[in-house]
């Protein structure tokens, strides 16, 4: 199982446009095979920042979700929309049976 966490700091004049594009990702992504959950939210203390957290069965599910056209749309606008580099971390949440 993989967990993806991304934080995006939008330019103030691009924040609403980015939020609208991000909103288009959630429903189709959740229907993608192998996507366990996906949530995107605005950071309450940083109104121009967004957090995306997703849980995938495996790397193939992550690749399927990231190949969706809605994701490509967001990726296309990120360079002009972000005020800081995209923060992206992928965690391996697989449990070693020897540890249980």
Model-derived features: where do they sit?
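Glycine-rich beta-strand-turn "strand-cap" elements at beta-sheet edges
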Residues: 2, 36-48, 76-100
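Anionic, Ser/Thr-rich low-complexity intrinsically disordered regions
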Residues: 2-4, 19, 74
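Short, surface-exposed ligand-recognition loops at beta-strand->loop->(often short) alpha-helix junctions
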Residues: 9-17
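A short local loop/turn or secondary-structure capping micro-motif enriched for an aromatic residue
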Residues: 12-13, 60-61, 98
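A contiguous binding-surface segment within folded domains or other stable secondary-structure elements
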Residues: 17-23
